[in-house]
Amino acid sequence: MFPYPQLNFPPVYPTNPMAYRDPNPPRCRWRPFRPPLAAQIEDLRRSIANLTFKQRSPNPPPGPPPKKKKSAPKPKPTQPKKKKQQAKKTKRKPKPGKRQRMCMKLESDKTFPIMLNGQVNGYACVVGGRLMKPLHVEGKIDNEQLAAVKLKKASMYDLEYGDVPQNMKSDTLQYTSDKPPGFYNWHHGAVQYENGRFTVPRGVGGKGDSGRPILDNRGRVVAIVLGGANEGTRTALSVVTWNQKGVTIKDTPEGSEPWSLVTALCVLSNVTFPCDKPPVCYSLAPERTLDVLEENVDNPNYDTLLENVLKCPSRRPKRSITDDFTLTSPYLGFCPYCRHSAPCFSPIKIENVWDESDDGSIRIQVSAQFGYNQAGTADVTKFRYMSFDHDHDIKEDSMDKIAISTSGPCRRLGHKGYFLLAQCPPGDSVTVSITSGASENSCTVEKKIRRKFVGREEYLFPPVHGKLVKCHVYDHLKETSAGYITMHRPGPHAYKSYLEEASGEVYIKPPSGKNVTYECKCGDYSTGIVSTRTKMNGCTKAKQCIAYKSDQTKWVFNSPDLIRHTDHSVQGKLHIPFRLTPTVCPVPLAHTPTVTKWFKGITLHLTATRPTLLTTRKLGLRADATAEWITGTTSRNFSVGREGLEYVWGNHEPVRVWAQESAPGDPHGWPHEIIIHYYHRHPVYTVIVLCGVALAILVGTASSAACIAKARRDCLTPYALAPNATVPTALAVLCCIRPTNAETFGETLNHLWFNNQPFLWAQLCIPLAALVILFRCFSCCMPFLLVAGVCLGKVDAFEHATTVPNVPGIPYKALVERAGYAPLNLEITVVSSELTPSTNKEYVTCRFHTVIPSPQVKCCGSLECKASSKADYTCRVFGGVYPFMWGGAQCFCDSENTQLSEAYVEFAPDCTIDHAVALKVHTAALKVGLRIVYGNTTAHLDTFVNGVTPGSSRDLKVIAGPISAAFSPFDHKVVIRKGLVYNYDFPEYGAMKPGAFGDIQASSLDATDIVARTDIRLLKPSVKNIHVPYTQAVSGYEMWKNNSGRPLQETAPFGCKIEVEPLRASNCAYGHIPISIDIPDAAFVRSSESPTILEVSCTVADCIYSADFGGSLTLQYKADREGHCPVHSHSTTAVLKEATTHVTAVGSITLHFSTSSPQANFIVSLCGKKTTCNAECKPPADHIIGEPHKVDQEFQAAVSKTSWNWLLALFGGASSLIVVGLIVLVCSSMLINTRR
């Protein structure tokens, strides 16, 4: 496939005539020099030609095209020239895009729209004699014959299909399973197919394109589009394709949405309308617009409705000066500290402060509004606030008058609506102030702003150059959404400025052009609405009346300092700007540590100009993880074993090191050198052996001395040498023993014939019975052997079974020997491994946000709580609040007033980034990536290690597992937070505990099934001002974050790398994997076609036992022909670096090997001919290296031959002393007894 230009469909109206275009445009090539005057004349001629022939006619007005005037007939002589030109054009090659246009015509003829409510909801196409329609697309096919076809549902593929009528079967599209990477044809342009996925540029295609086919250049259907998912700059398509067998396959990228054009409907007074076309707009009917938004606040398309009610239709387009915060109004709120002194009602009350960003920036919500002028239109240089003076009008001022501070001044980064974004120094409080002339309004709240840093090194300021790590910061764009804040219509609030007391009379004085509602109790209760200065009859004191105005065209924030309007519930919501978004942040890199290597250990010399974290873990079964923050210059010692050690210094990458069996002394030297060497390598065993040798020598010496002393004592005793000696008793006893000999076979049969004939015949039947049983076994097995012999000739693969260590990167080498064939070298390497457990998502938890709605206050009456589905919803009614007039609610009654206080919790706005997922972990499945080299062929494959599931690569078939040891770094319960995994025994779903992990739970972040228990307790309000006091437990999520310990990424054993999405442990080095391989016959070479080695001998030139290939050997050989031979080490003591080599008739080859033993005696084969190599290896010079050992150390090779000789000599000497003593003792005893 190849790219092609996007198609242009014929316009509704004729386009302007194209300008003249030279078919052979001038190019930058060498031309002969022309005089300047000739060049100027030529340029002038070209300019006149451009003005004459390249003029475009003006755009035609909308409507039917104007009639063309009849042009005069052109002279006849010009016609032949036109024909000539036309003939020349026909001789040219077809212009590019012709096949694409043909495909598009096929697509338009064989694709039929699906209509729903008069709109195209999707498409159906006829492919291979069948009608195919996406299952999620509702409506009727716009074709009478196809609309009558009965369709069958295939929900697995999101399709409906049926046979097309007989008269249409010959006129359908054909499908194909051939999809080479490249570009394909679609209705909206080119579709790229790469890595098994169809993608288009983002913004191409969308709702209503479901069911459109993707065609190749021959007009065959490659796929049918069902939907798509945005992935950055491109959109991945969800499609239905076919495989080589014609079976349907559905390929759905993660996060894809179906592309059916379903019109989103909203409701207004039981009448539905499209959400993108509301019947009202805010500029024309503000109160009605708020009614529409409140009625559809829970509609999934609320954001679409909110966006469109701000756009009023007009005859000409103009820049919009309204946005979502135009619907709102600033307000006065109760601030605990005004100007760092007493509490007050402040025009810039701080409602919330968020400090979840990793770069130290904070997001503040206040009662003023930023980016708007006094009228409420957008103006980035202004802000507006509610004045506390007189009539509480809304005023505006310059954004330069806004100041934010903590322990020092803050830098403002952005603003929108009620929200500010600022960069602040650390502090214990946050202050926002308005400086206007000599007056200043400020509000201070207690909030600890900590110094933030990312990574493993603390820093005050991010570096200019460093390492980039993942972090989360507040997005400076105002259009991003971090969630919603709830809004409501403001309730009535009385102002004293609306009352005037003069000469014992009371007047209602509304602002100019405003209506004011009054309530008076001057004997009788009276109420009304006035717009001009009005006298209240019978009233003598201003405190007998209250006057207020209620604006139902604006929303205010759902603040606990405001009374909720009695006619409206809390239903509005607006977006919170400055979303917390993932990005990368620069972090510093500490000085690289200096490493000193010693025997089985390292010393890290560290220099840190700032607090830097050092973590370590062992790569064996016991991780023994450590963590330490280091400042200044220091050194740390760590022991390193054969299993390895991993350390991470600051923001540097992890470093893994392994110990070599290096030690002073010489395992092949003198006894003192041998003792020094083995004492450093194996101190305990060396001490035990030395103690045993010393004890043997001591026992031998003592025994020999005792025997000699006893013999001397016996010989020198006078009475023991008496005359008339007799024969010793021991010799006399030997004379009493009768000589015996066994009877022959003939004598035995003769004895049985004359004495016991039945037993004779029984003895003769035993061999006969054995022969009968053997022949019967052969007769039973003969059919199986015959079948096996027949099938043996038909087998096309040779099965080889072996066991491979599950250590990524360490190859396992074997030699496959098959009768009649030359040996085949086999190398198996575990390239990667993934231990993926099956998980069950229990719930999602994060920091909760407590919502305190504006209270409901009823003067001279009572209220009742109602049930609610909100999480941890608490409601209480308090009586006797805000007594007669001087209370915050300004009620006329004394003790009959009531307040309904509510509280509930929800997920914090930044939970989309900072949250934890609680998972239950079950059985894990191990999947390994293998690299198998047999002969000259290399194969890569992935297979599950379960002993059942086969893996294949071309002609190679592999069955792996089950693994020798069951292991998983995950406990039964794990918690995932920001990509880090913790083993944590979290509470079950629904078993919430206040102040503990899981105090707020939900199935997902956007779910509505939130449950919580945070111990909210509502308190009775004081009488001074409207408020909702409460107490609550601390966030359990924040407590867990501060005490969660270290993640599994730093503490997992066996060097596992823990990853998420999905949860898995990668490259864990543990256990052994049994593997059965079916090697194809083509890989083997018959013995008659390969060289035969006649003689071979091995000489070891040099040997250093280490993790590297420190040994070198030479094979002297004689062969019958020239060719290639496999070489292999048949012992686990050593492994060869080379797998094959070239041999001649007579010659030698040099090979390299790796061993971990001082005495490496191993068998090497060349083309199947074996020989033994004896290597006395020296210890390596490097104590610590950066790669693991390739072979393990064995006991028989751990002790050198020289050491065995010295050890046996010592034991032999000790035993010789004992033997000498015993000989002396026996000789003396015999002498004494003889003389007696």
Swiss-Prot record:
Task: Enumerate the Extracellular topological stretches.
Answer: 260-687, 743-767, 810-1205
Q: Where is this region: Ribosome-binding?
A: 96-110
Which positions does the motif Supraphysiological nuclear export signal occupy? Answer: 44-51
Region of interest (Disordered), ranges: 44-103
A GO molecular-function term, please? structural molecule activity
Q: Where is this region: E1 fusion peptide loop?
A: 881-898
Transmembrane region positions? 688-708, 768-788, 789-809, 1206-1226
Coiled coil ranges: none
Residues of the region (Host transcription inhibition) are 37-70
Catalytic function, reaction form: Autocatalytic release of the core protein from the N-terminus of the togavirus structural polyprotein by hydrolysis of a -Trp-|-Ser- bond
- List the active-site residues: 136, 158, 210
One Gene Ontology term, aspect cellular component: host cell plasma membrane
Task: Name the residues annotated as site: Cleavage.
Answer: 259-260, 319-320, 742-743, 797-798
Which residues does the record list as glycosylated? 270, 515, 637, 936, 1042, 1067
Q: What class of enzyme is it?
A: hydrolase
What's any GO biological process attached to this entry? symbiont-mediated suppression of host toll-like receptor signaling pathway
Q: Where is the composition biased (Basic residues)?
A: 66-102
For the site labelled Involved in dimerization of the capsid protein, the residues are 184, 217
Q: Please give the function described in this protein's UniProt entry.
A: Protein 6K: Acts as a viroporin that participates in virus glycoprotein processing and transport to the plasma membrane, cell permeabilization and budding of viral particles. Disrupts the calcium homeostasis of the cell, probably at the endoplasmic reticulum level resulting in the increased levels of cytoplasmic calcium.
User: Know the name of this protein?
Assistant: Structural polyprotein
Q: Which organism is it from?
A: Western equine encephalitis virus (WEEV)
